[in-house]
Design a protein with these regions (language model features):
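Ribonuclease/tRNase effector modules and their secretory precursors
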Residues: 1-89
């Protein structure tokens, strides 16, 4: 599995949400993480909800090629996403 992202967007995400895209990659270490469809755009996007330390985070991602995950944004999980995470465990 390989990650790609825009470095400037990662820095902006850190300033806005308190997490950059390098830190966000640890979401994939959560064995209970879930994936939900994101709102349709011009490319298929997904929401990955998982835990980092004691907080739930949501990453918006798209898949490129076979093993590449492109991080688009990361933020704290919303209440409905938290409920989905808990029910999926």
């Amino acid at each position: 599995m390989r990650f790609e992202f825009d470095a400037a967007k990662s820095a902006a995400n850190k300033a806005k949400h308190g997490i950059d895209f390098v830190e966000a990659q640890t979401l994939w270490l959560d064995p209970d993480r879930i994936e939900l469809p994101a709102r349709p755009t011009n490319e298929p996007r997904f929401l990955l909800v998982g835990q980092i330390t004691q907080a739930l985070w949501t990453a918006t991602v798209t898949y490129r090629h076979e093993e590449t995950i492109r991080l688009i944004s990361v933020r704290r999980a919303r209440e409905n996403e938290k409920a989905e995470y808990v029910s999926g465990r």
